[in-house]
Every structure is written in structure tokens, then in C-alpha cells.
């Protein structure tokens, strides 16, 4: 009888912890900016900057004497 009460007590703790973590997860989500739903940081900009930097570095190394 005591074992079943202890087991049910741990399940209650797990349920409470799970609901707390779920609530905390919702608060940690980044808010969406604008109406189009894009994140605040655009990774397309990072991609294009990387490509441009890569091309500039290639041209610089290619033209070295």
C-alpha cells in the first residue's frame, strides 16, 4: 500500500514538472516579427553574406601574384 502511494506521488511530481516545463518552453519561444512570420534573424542574409565573402576571398587569392 505504501509503495503504491509513493509511486503515485512520483507520478504527480512528474506531471507537475512536465506542465511547468511546457509553460516555460512557451515563454522561451522567440516572438515572430512582422505579419509574414519570419524570425527576427534572417538566415538568408547570412547565406548571401557567406557566398559573397567566399567569392571575394576566392578572387583575392586567385589574383595574388
Swiss-Prot record:
<keyword id="KW-1133">Transmembrane helix</keyword>
<feature type="modified residue" description="N-acetylmethionine">
    <location>
        <position position="1"/>
    </location>
</feature>
<comment type="subunit">
    <text>Homooligomer. Can also form heterooligomers with other sarcoplasmic/endoplasmic reticulum calcium ATPase (SERCA) regulators ERLN, PLN, SLN and STRIT1/DWORF. Monomer. Interacts as a monomer with ATP2A2/SERCA2; the interaction results in inhibition of ATP2A2 Ca(2+) affinity.</text>
</comment>
<keyword id="KW-0812">Transmembrane</keyword>
<keyword id="KW-0007">Acetylation</keyword>
<feature type="modified residue" description="Phosphoserine">
    <location>
        <position position="19"/>
    </location>
</feature>
<keyword id="KW-0472">Membrane</keyword>
<feature type="region of interest" description="Disordered">
    <location>
        <begin position="1"/>
        <end position="36"/>
    </location>
</feature>
<feature type="compositionally biased region" description="Basic and acidic residues">
    <location>
        <begin position="12"/>
        <end position="28"/>
    </location>
</feature>
<protein>
    <recommendedName>
        <fullName>Sarcoplasmic/endoplasmic reticulum calcium ATPase regulator ARLN</fullName>
    </recommendedName>
</protein>
<dbReference type="InterPro" id="IPR038780">
    <property type="entry name" value="ALN"/>
</dbReference>
<feature type="transmembrane region" description="Helical">
    <location>
        <begin position="44"/>
        <end position="64"/>
    </location>
</feature>
<dbReference type="GO" id="GO:0005789">
    <property type="term" value="C:endoplasmic reticulum membrane"/>
</dbReference>
<keyword id="KW-0597">Phosphoprotein</keyword>
<comment type="function">
    <text>Inhibits the activity of the calcium ATPases ATP2A2/SERCA2 and ATP2A3/SERCA3 by decreasing their apparent affinity for Ca(2+).</text>
</comment>
<dbReference type="Pfam" id="PF17696">
    <property type="entry name" value="ALN"/>
</dbReference>
<keyword id="KW-0256">Endoplasmic reticulum</keyword>
Amino acid at each position: 500500500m505504501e509503495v503504491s502511494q509513493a509511486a503515485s506521488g512520483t507520478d504527480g511530481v512528474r506531471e507537475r514538472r512536465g506542465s511547468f516545463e511546457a509553460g516555460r518552453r512557451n515563454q522561451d519561444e522567440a516572438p515572430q516579427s512582422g505579419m509574414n512570420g519570419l524570425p527576427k534573424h534572417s538566415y538568408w542574409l547570412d547565406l548571401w553574406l557567406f557566398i559573397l565573402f567566399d567569392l571575394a576571398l576566392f578572387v583575392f587569392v586567385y589574383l595574388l601574384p
